[in-house]
Amino acid sequence: MIITQVELYKSPVKLKEPFKISLGILTHANNVIVRIHTASGHIGYGECSPFMTIHGESMDTAFIVGQYLAKGLIGTSCLDIVSNSLLMDAIIYGNSCIKSAFNIALYDLAAQHAGLPLYAFLGGKKDKIIQTDYTVSIDEPHKMAADAVQIKKNGFEIIKVKVGGSKELDVERIRMIREAAGDSITLRIDANQGWSVETAIETLTLLEPYNIQHCEEPVSRNLYTALPKIRQACRIPIMADESCCNSFDAERLIQIQACDSFNLKLSKSAGITNALNIIRLAEQAHMPVQVGGFLESRLGFTAAAHVALVSKTICYYDFDTPLMFEADPVRGGIVYQQRGIIEVPETAGLGAGYQKDYLSGLEKICIN
């Protein structure tokens, strides 16, 4: 299973509607696809969705850095995943997003070689239901309430709401959404680092009557030492997202009792290898974990869904963004069923790829 060729593709996909969070507005998912070929004829797929405000990467930078990573991996064994992860770290510091795409492709190949679906290769089992939420982008309260009603009509039972503005506006957003969607809907909120410490405490306290499941990343990730104060002052559980990128972050947050749960994303952790380390730390600390992502296609979320089956500590799922795409370029992969329930493929490996017609229209570079 020697790596002989790597293909990189720029993959911009238009969204049905602009995706708005406190950090900015996106009209496209600007992703990068990685295809790794081996001497045995196997092909492994990976994908990443860079956010400049979170990863410090873009589609263009990931495409360039990916070429350096590809050159380093040519001639190595795709089965030496840990060694190849260390090799990528030696080639360039950071750049976790593009590294995650390579790491996913390596795991795809390794699971194919083992003849197992990826979740089974990772030691996971299909012993639980994966039910995704659906996100309401940040907007005017009446628009967000209308969106929540439509999401409920579409059969989703869990709604994630983007907040992170003024205290008054965020409370009005949640009040109107709860009234419009009703008490049967599970509500989660995500501030995307949008509040100050004081605003976070005040806003979360005012939101307590609305039965919020948890709040993701209330303040800047640089203010992670303030999370214990927020957690102690409020009854709504705190989930670390941007402040938890790797196992070192997770261990630090556990030590200072900064949060109630982690939001795990493969492109933050540079892929599956370090994601598994975070999961083990969460298990030891008896902390629940959410698995989510950015604006990956169904292929990226197929990888995330396989990972979600490796531990019972993973109990929250945020896999909705492929449903926001105008067109679906993926063949195989996860299947969205009623109520937001997700079926994970049984095919050996990742069980997902891209339509040939789609790839042929993308900007591409091949490294041998």
Curated annotation (Swiss-Prot):
Tell me a GO biological process for this protein. Answer: peptide metabolic process
Q: List the disulfide bonds.
A: none
What's one Pfam family here? MR_MLE_C
According to its UniProt record, this protein's enzyme class is: isomerase
What keywords were assigned to this record?
Answer: Isomerase, Magnesium, Metal-binding
Summarize where substrate binds, as residue positions: 135, 160-162, 265, 318-320
Organism domain of life: Bacteria
The record describes how the cofactor is bound as: Binds 1 Mg(2+) ion per subunit.
Q: Name one GO molecular function term.
A: racemase and epimerase activity
- What are the required cofactors? Mg(2+)
EC number, UniProt record:
5.1.1.-
- Residues where Mg(2+) binds: 190, 216, 241
Give the PANTHER family listed for this entry. O-SUCCINYLBENZOATE SYNTHASE, O-SUCCINYLBENZOATE SYNTHASE-RELATED
Per the record, the similarity remark reads: Belongs to the mandelate racemase/muconate lactonizing enzyme family.
Explain the purpose of this protein: Catalyzes the epimerization of D-Ala-D-Ala to D-Ala-L-Ala. Has broad substrate specificity and catalyzes the epimerization of a variety of dipeptides containing an N-terminal Ala followed by a hydrophobic or polar residue, such as Val, Ser and Met (in vitro).
Q: What further note is attached to this protein's record?
A: Part of a large, functionally divergent protein family. Protein modeling and substrate docking were used to predict the substrate specificity, prior to biochemical analysis.
* Name of protein: D-Ala-D/L-Ala epimerase
Species of origin: Cytophaga hutchinsonii (strain ATCC 33406 / DSM 1761 / CIP 103989 / NBRC 15051 / NCIMB 9469 / D465)
| Upper lineage | Bacteria, Pseudomonadati, Bacteroidota, Cytophagia, Cytophagales
Please name the gene that encodes this protein. Answer: tfdD
